[in-house]
Regions:
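Carbohydrate-interacting/catalytic domains
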Residues: 7-12, 17-20, 27-28, 33, ...
């Protein structure tokens, strides 16, 4: 249920809320958040409890939305990405890809010509690095094809192939949400921005 405050959120800080928002917004065609999630509210009723200290089950809780430290800009961006990509509006098109680090999750969703590739750091405390190996046919591409991937969160564009290096730092880049595009005329394979 959305009103459960799991230990991951209690101790993971803002980065835990960010990575969970990315996962929820991209794995499923529908998503929602509990009031206060965008403010990263994570105070439990008592140590070891999964219940919020100021649960709305028992009271109305006023919040100062204008001065709060919030992940609302990330949530707004995720909603914009979801509207822009039909692949994220489908349920049965989820495909997982390999990363050589268990703290990095990689998956794609494809609908017609629209393909979205998501790479998420599951560790809210530490920077994680991995080599991501793409199942190119699952992306609708030839095995040796080069790709241009545009990160919808940062605006950066990379040239990717079958094997790619990623580095995701909590608080800076919780994930990549890539729009997979046709490769540039002279691709440079690797993790450096192409533009």
């Amino acid at each position: 249920t959305p009103d459960i405050l799991h230990a991951f959120l209690q101790h993971g800080g803002r980065a835990a809320f960010e990575l969970r928002a990315v996962l929820a917004a991209t794995l499923s065609p529908t998503w929602g958040i509990y009031s206060g999630y965008e403010l990263c509210e994570n105070t439990p009723l008592r140590e070891g409890s999964e219940e919020y200290l100021d649960s709305e089950k028992y009271q109305l809780r006023p919040r100062d939305w204008d001065t709060a430290d919030t992940i609302a800009p990330l949530i707004t961006k995720l909603n914009t990405i979801r509207r822009r990509h039909p692949a994220l509006q489908r349920l049965r098109n989820l495909r997982f890809h390999h990363a050589d680090n268990d703290a990095v999750l990689v998956f794609s969703k494809r609908a017609g010509q629209d393909t979205v590739l998501v790479v998420v750091n599951l560790d809210p405390h530490h920077t994680q690095e991995a080599t991501v190996s793409l199942d190119m046919p699952q992306l609708g591409r030839d095995r040796d094809e080069s790709l241009s991937v545009h990160d919808e969160l940062t605006g950066e564009t990379y040239a990717w192939g079958t094997h790619n290096y990623v580095r995701l730092e909590p608080g800076r880049a919780p994930a990549h949400v890539f729009h997979v595009q046709a490769a540039p005329a002279s691709p440079q394979i690797g993790g450096s921005p192409a533009s």
